A protein has these predicted regions:
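Short alpha-helical interface patches
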Residues: 17, 36-37, 101
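Short glycine-rich, Thr/Ser-proximal phosphate-binding strand/loop in the N-terminal lobe
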Residues: 23-45, 128-133
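Anionic-ligand binding patches
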Residues: 2-6, 20, 44-137
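N-terminal G-site helix/loop of the GST-like fold
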Residues: 5-30
């Protein structure tokens, strides 16, 4: 019986290092997903649903018809929820000025980091999903 290949659906060196430290054999394949295209779904899905939807979209982008791999994909959504205002997604700032502005917006407030993880069996289409939410101040 041929062992199943675990595919880490990520371009993150940090996620790859985690699996390496665990001694888990895997191959890394970056998914082709425009994460920002999903921003408008925050109100409908909430942070937890959005994180899972992004992780699943990454797995679906890597799935091959007739494949037999296990696809491990994840996404983290940062969100600032202020009473009386719609939730605000926190993206990677991109510039030093944007970083300062984001840090100022977070100062003295609690924000959430929500992780969605999907393990998709390419052969059956079955998926296991996990969501973790951490509140940070």
């Amino acid at each position: 019986m041929t062992p199943t290949t675990l595919v880490l659906g990520s371009s993150s060196v940090y996620r790859a290092r985690m699996l390496e430290r665990l001694g888990v054999p895997f191959v890394q394949e970056p998914p082709d997903v425009d994460e920002r295209a999903f921003d408008g779904l925050l109100g409908e899905l909430g942070p937890e649903g959005l994180a899972l939807r992004l992780a699943r979209a990454k797995a679906d982008s890597l799935a091959r018809p007739g494949g037999s791999r296990q696809l491990l994909c994840a996404d983290q959504v940062g969100v600032l929820e202020v009473e009386g205002a719609p939730p605000r997604l926190l993206h990677k700032p991109g510039t030093p000025d944007a970083c300062v502005a984001q840090l100022m917006a977070l100062s003295g407030r609690t924000h959430a980091l929500v992780n969605g993880v999907v393990l998709l069996d390419e052969a059956t289409g079955d998926a296991r999903e996990l969501v973790d939410r951490q509140e940070l101040t």
